[in-house]
Amino acid sequence: SFHDFKRTPDDLQGLHDYLADLDADVVKIATLANHPNDNLRMLELVRSSSPPTVGLCMGEIGTPSRVLAGQFGAAFTFAPFNPEKILAPGQIPWKQLCEMYRYDAITPSTKVYGVIADPVGHSLSPVVHNAACAAAGIDAVYLPFLVPKGHLGDVLKNSKRWPLAGLSVTIPHKENVVGFASSQGDLVEEIGAANTISFDDETRAMKVFNTDVTAAVAAIQASLAAQEVGFGGRLGLKTVLILGAGGAARAIAFGLRQQGVEVTIASRTVGRSQTLAELVNGKVVEWSGRHRLPYDCVVNATPIGMHPKVNETPFEAKHLRPYMVVFDTVYNPENTMLVKEAQDVGCKVVTGVEMFVRQAAEQFKIWHGQEPPEGVMRMALKQATSSVRIIE
């Protein structure tokens, strides 16, 4: 066996040949992944090698190599029975590997999906999509792919070498991913951001979609309907302050503008705020001035308050008013600092859980061509975080 806790060597084949010549029954190679494609190089080595080979990439970037080891022909993988006794960086506890990822059911024909993000450790997309696939009897597995911003192009250019069928896209890739697509779904060109990739089974052509727009508006409508007697389905909002100017902010701003809402953008990068404001015929305020004017609704479309930095908020509590609607797109945790403080003031609150489940359900339809088990998806998210509920 061979271990390298710093990198994945360039000449994996040469290393394997050296170990195989030692008259080994099984060759094991474990290296640290510094690039997402290190997983691919390792798995391709496993698939083409004799004698039987176990090739694993360590670290968070290396997660796919551990889950897909069997699909590529590895003799076995490693998983600690006790999650408190992780012996190597990136090891996945046995229960998670077997129950969430269904490792024993993965075969060469299993379709692979995942989420590309940086960071990705907080994402509960694997929990939700794997539960949905299991409930629907779909032969698929959904993985977290840690893809730093500078590596997006390399990963997508090599996507044909993976058994990938589709990807969710989140921070920081929602805007950049559009430029790599062969085709686009509705609204993507107008918004300039996508959160979903589908790969054609035969041509491997990449089509991008945006399921955030309808999910965001529907989440607000559903939450307000539950909190307002006689709510007729229209938002009833006149002015909305959106915090952030990234992919999620773009989708929400576009969806709200379609509802006739006046949108104001505030982010730490004025240029990005101006670009988004022009897209939706909205206004811009500097980040430092976001508290100065009253709004019917405040939307947090930044990662502020996301796990593990749960004690941060993008909007100071002293500026919240009881008549406001507060929508936080962060779903992990569901009850962010912003949500708690808005609830204390008496605001109507929309948590990120409803938007998350709705956009994931639309992704499920795109990938699998059937209605999603939304109840299962909500329950999986509920078990992973806190109770899914409308806060009154």
What annotation goes with each model-predicted range?
Residues 110-226:
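Phosphate/diphosphate ligand-binding glycine-rich loop within oxidoreductases
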Residues 1-109:
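Catalytic alpha/beta core domains of metabolic enzymes, predominantly
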Residues 259-280:
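NAD(P)-binding Rossmann-fold cofactor-contacting core
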Residues 258-262, 345-348:
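Conserved S-adenosyl-L-methionine
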Residues 57, 112-120, 210-213, 220, ...:
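Glycine-rich adenosine-cofactor-binding loop
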Residues 324-374, 379-380:
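Rossmann-fold NAD(P)-binding glycine/threonine-rich loop
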Residues 278-349:
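Rossmann-like adenosine-cofactor binding region
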